[in-house]
Amino acid sequence: MASDTAPQATGAGRIVISVDAMGGDRGPAAVVAGIAGSASANPGAYFIVHGDEAQIGPMIAKRKDLRGRCEIRHAPRVVTMSDKPSQVMRHGEGTSMWSCIESVRAGEATVAVSCGNTGALMAVSMIRLRKLPGVNRPAIACLWPSRNPGGFNVMLDVGADIKADAEDLAQFALMGASYARNGLSLERPRVGLLNVGTEEHKGRAELKSAQDLISANAEAGAYEYVGFLEGGDIPGRRCDVIVTDGFTGNVALKTGEGTAKLISDFLRDAFGANVLSKMAAVLALGSLKRLQKRIDPRRVNGGVFLGLNGTVVKSHGSADATGVAAAIGLAVRLARSGFHERLAARLASAGRAGQDAPQDEVAAPRQI
């Protein structure tokens, strides 16, 4: 029961996003609600929605703001959170995740969005989209709320692969700088390498080797290398791009999200303790709402797979409608900016002194 035929991503003058409706913990209802939320903020966006048509069809039909903007692609099977990536690589055809990535591969959509199993999504993305020339190990980049003027830092890798040698980390620096340059409109991003301390003698041998490579590539990569970073620098002003391996980055990301929720819970308990506290909460309601919005991890939901022949945004599996809308909003911004083409150009020119493509349509991230 597709509402209409989705436009081709290439040459149609419209932004088309491919969405896996079935992979999240909250089911397709949260995904469809997220699509609707993002659609209202992005009137030029259209969607190819992949999943069980019997489930998602009625949900989409009930939403007037999605009429004429969605095409449903029936996919009878679902990749679960317990499925192994190796199994999905061999037997994933027919799943909503596979179908979602296939739309990007076929040129029907510019960016894919999924709340599904991270390992499986990376595996499917790698075998269907393939890596960009010269990329050894793709990475997942996320936006981290920070004290910088733009409000965000970029951190990668946050979970694509637990391993990363010195050459991988140096390539992450190039990709992260390109993302910050085009996604955050930073002409010369500041890049740092996450370590257990800022002193030169600290850290594993591969980090010291990576530091030499990242520093040597700074001029060609059009970024400024600021040296080693500590965990406290992740939300700070010292850098714009934090480079690390996927294990460390994922632990840091989940710790940050848990801390944000803990602070929110503490504030709720403190202002609900007694009558005076509740009166104070009423007086400070506007400020509290602004604070809650700023530290709400749902509003910066969405990790970007870098280094592939296509753009994929990974939403948290537990994302609600707000989180899904944020991830789709990020996908729309990346599609509108032509980010994939610019990243490919940056990597292709990494051995030369070339620059990214002009930033003629790049918008800084905004919260949805």
UniProtKB/Swiss-Prot annotation:
Localization, per the record, is: Cytoplasm
Q: Which GO terms describe its cellular component?
A: cytoplasm
Q: What class of enzyme is it?
A: transferase
Q: Which GO terms describe its molecular function?
A: phosphate:acyl-[acyl carrier protein] acyltransferase activity
Checking Pfam families in the record gives:
FA_synthesis
Biological process annotations from GO = fatty acid biosynthetic process; phospholipid biosynthetic process
Q: In which pathway does it act?
A: Lipid metabolism; phospholipid metabolism
**Purpose of the protein:** Catalyzes the reversible formation of acyl-phosphate (acyl-PO(4)) from acyl-[acyl-carrier-protein] (acyl-ACP). This enzyme utilizes acyl-ACP as fatty acyl donor, but not acyl-CoA.
> What is the official name of this protein in its record?
Phosphate acyltransferase
- Name of the encoding gene: plsX
